């Protein structure tokens, strides 16, 4: 009887995860995973998985490196394997850190702001995952140690938004091809501006984007990325914030080889 009940429970879990989010690696130690349904934690509109890798030789973690995907099914799906990235694992191991990769189960045509604005529930889900993963892994310090945030596109928007909400928790942030708004944009009324707290000026931030995202190529799908990055940079630098920008010379919105700049400087 117990076997039958367990079978149907497993089937229910599998059926609840729709393609392309239903195929992912098993999380066996040193990997750990938690998953929340939509609205299970706060107001988050979509289900989400948080997978973390913890170096086995580390007794007490010093921080968490968060690798945050962007918008759309293809990018969100990449978060399912992000914790297995050997380059980022090497960086995490070097600093006695964990490596986390969230995966928001956003339908392709859904509004990305429903998760990439952390005020829409992803902040609450992220912080709850640290508590739950701390219990699961035997590393309760996950709930309190600082974060280094890397995000691409909508993930950059999310990481930058977290800097505004939790500057006291963040060591550094790398925003690839995406930043939050600090002023209202009448062309994007669906995106709410963040307040810029004084403490956020102390967080080192790198804005990194491809040259074809409006820097050298002023037309095309991603031409608005550079103006948004420039406005974000100028607002923070005008108040002596710790911010810089870098232009990848060969790319558009794809990540390209930016990791070879990001990882050594994180």
Name each model feature, range by range:
Residues 114-140:
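Alpha/beta-hydrolase active-site loop
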Residues 70-72, 95, 123-124, 148-150, ...:
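Serine-hydrolase-like catalytic core of hydrolytic proteins
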Residues 3-12:
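Sec-dependent N-terminal signal peptides
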Residues 262-266:
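Catalytic active-site module of serine/aspartate enzymes centered on a nucleophile-bearing elbow/loop
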Residues 58-109, 182-183, 215-217:
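Short substrate-entry loop that stabilizes the transition state in hydrolases
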Residues 60-64, 94-100, 143-147, 167-172, ...:
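Loop/turn elements at helix/coil->beta-strand transitions in domains of secreted/extracellular proteins
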Residues 16-64, 94-95, 145-168:
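A domain-start/cap signature at the N-terminus of enzymes
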Residues 171-260:
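The feature captures the conserved acid-bearing segment of alpha/beta-hydrolase catalytic domains
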């Amino acid at each position: 009887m117990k076997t039958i009940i367990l079978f149907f429970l497993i089937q229910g879990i599998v059926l609840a995860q729709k393609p392309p989010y239903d195929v992912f690696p098993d999380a066996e130690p040193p990997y750990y995973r938690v998953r929340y349904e939509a609205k299970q934690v706060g107001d988050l509109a979509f289900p989400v998985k948080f997978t973390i890798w913890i170096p086995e030789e580390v007794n007490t973690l010093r921080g968490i490196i968060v690798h945050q995907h962007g918008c759309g099914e293809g990018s969100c799906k990449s978060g399912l394997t992000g914790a297995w990235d050997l380059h980022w694992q090497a960086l995490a191991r070097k600093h006695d850190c964990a490596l986390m990769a969230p995966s928001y189960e956003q339908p392709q045509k859904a509004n990305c702001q429903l998760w990439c604005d952390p005020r829409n529930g992803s902040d609450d889900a992220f912080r709850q995952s640290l508590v739950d993963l701390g219990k699961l892994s035997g590393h309760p310090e996950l709930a309190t140690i600082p974060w280094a945030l890397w995000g691409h596109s909508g993930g950059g928007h999310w990481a930058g938004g977290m800097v505004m909400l939790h500057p006291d928790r963040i060591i550094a942030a790398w925003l690839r091809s995406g930043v939050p708004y600090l002023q209202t944009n009448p062309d994007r009324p669906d995106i709410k501006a963040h307040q810029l707290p004084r403490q956020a000026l102390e967080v080192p931030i790198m804005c990194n984007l491809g040259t074809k995202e409006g820097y050298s190529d002023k037309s095309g799908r991603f031409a608005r990325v550079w103006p948004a990055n420039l406005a974000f940079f100028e607002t923070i630098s005008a108040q002596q914030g710790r911010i810089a920008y870098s232009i990848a010379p060969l790319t558009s919105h794809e990540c390209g080889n930016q990791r070879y700049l990001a990882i050594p400087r994180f």
